Amino acid sequence: MRSYMDGGGAAAYEEEEEEVEDDDGGGGGGGGGGGGGLGEKKRRLAAEQVRALERSFEADNKLDPERKARIARDLRLHPRQVAVWFQNRRARWKTKQIERDFAALRSRHDALRLECDALRRDKDALAAEIADLRDRVDGQMSVKLEAVAADEHQPPPPPPPPPLAYNSKVVDGSTDSDSSAVFNEEASPYSGAAIDHHHHQTPASYDTAGFTSFFAPSTTLTSSLSFPSMFHASSHFDGHQELLVGGGGAGAVADADLGGAGFFAGDEHAGGLSWYGAEGW
């Protein structure tokens, strides 16, 4: 048994068609003997009828009794044929809709899966970078802690040496350098102390006869030779005697007051310069 729809039909539609055909066959038999062959005639939908039903389905896939009767009247079909066609068309439409929805969902799922994989790779890369940075920070912190620990265990540097004290010692208001200078002045044969000692020495300690004979008086040489710079009151003997006022004694002060002439105050000293030219001349 074939259905009235192009492209096949459902079992429910075939059962509905059988019921319609049985009704038609029974009606034909009751009408007369010649009408018995009508029940065996098969009806098929024309192409125009199929296009009209498609337009009606696209407009509204719901089929109420009034609309079913109007479509059947316009297409010259039985109302039950119209109802079965709409039922089968809704089933195919639902199947195609499910297939379209499934394809869309599957494509969306694939896109989300790819995006999820990309996000997972990014997450793994970021986690590896974070771990690397954490290792670097831990290494730097460990190095700093080791340096701090080494600084703590290292003994402190020794204190700097104290500044060297000045070695000169002040004794009675004068330093060692001043004392050494005074000592050198006193040890010098030209110092005021030596001159004073020589001037005040007793005649018993000298060979007076030999000394006077050695320094024989020579009036000509004495008168011709003069040493103003050597025996002048402003000579360097005065400077030494002034420096040694505290240690040269009263004789040095007396010689300084005499303007340097105290060294050769006596006649024997004044004539003592004859040896410069007594024998050489």
UniProtKB/Swiss-Prot annotation:
Segments of skewed composition (Gly residues): 1-10, 26-38
Biased composition (Pro residues): 155-164
Subcellular location(s) per record: Nucleus
UniProt KW keywords: DNA-binding, Homeobox, Nucleus, Transcription, Transcription regulation
InterPro entries with a match to the protein in the record: HD (IPR001356), HDZip_class_I_plant (IPR045224), Homeobox_CS (IPR017970), Homeodomain-like_sf (IPR009057), Leu_zip_homeo (IPR003106)
Family: Belongs to the HD-ZIP homeobox family. Class I subfamily.
Chain's role: Probable transcription factor.
Family matches, as PANTHER family: HOMEOBOX-LEUCINE ZIPPER PROTEIN, HOMEOBOX-LEUCINE ZIPPER PROTEIN HOX8
UniProt protein name: Homeobox-leucine zipper protein HOX8
